[in-house]
Amino acid sequence: MARFIVGLRGGIGTGKSAVSNIFESLGVDIADADISSRNVMKPGKEAFEKVVDHFGKDILDSAGEINRPRLRKIVFSKPEEKVFLENLTVPSIIEDLLKKIHRSTSEYVMLVLSTGRGKTNLMNRLLVVDAKKNSQIKRVMERDKISSKEVEAIIATQPNR
């Protein structure tokens, strides 16, 4: 297990991936909540089955996997659906992150989280990355091919700076 855990937090489109990529290039192991969330939602996983049961088969793409843009549109327009999804997936995400931390062979590990949620008692240091709101909106629109209205809806659900 890594001896020193550096937490990295920031809102959507603030540059967490760019920062974690720099650390990874320096040999630091990365435990990323976004990657863990994708892992726990793969076909065959318990969360996958519950998401499909709850949202219906229309939530699947042509390959039979969760259509993340479609799911994102639902959960960021209906707060109760976001709560449902978080309650369902967060325990599995935390478990996946802890496994990655414990398997780490580097002296350091970077724990990449979104904004303000998660266990800070695991971290020896916390880095926060931020960006101007208009930069966040532009980055996410380009990356995810979604509207500014959709990005603003996501930002609105995240804790204030």
Which sequence ranges carry the predicted segments?
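Walker A (P-loop) phosphate-binding motif
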Residues: M1-I35
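A general structural signal for well-ordered alpha-helical segments in protein cores
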Residues: I5, S20, F48, V52, ...
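N-terminal polybasic phosphate/anion-binding patch
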Residues: A18-N21, D29-K42, K57, E142, ...
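Short, structured coil segments at secondary-structure junctions
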Residues: L26, F55, N121-L122
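ATP-dependent small-molecule kinase phosphotransfer cores
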Residues: I35-T105
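A glycine- and Lys/Arg-enriched "phosphate-lid" helix/loop adjacent to the NTP-binding pocket
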Residues: F84, R125-R161
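Short gly/ser/thr-rich secondary-structure transition/capping motifs
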Residues: P91-E95, E107-S114, K149-T157
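ATP-dependent NMP and nucleoside kinases share a basic, alpha-helical "lid"
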Residues: D96-H102, Y108-E142
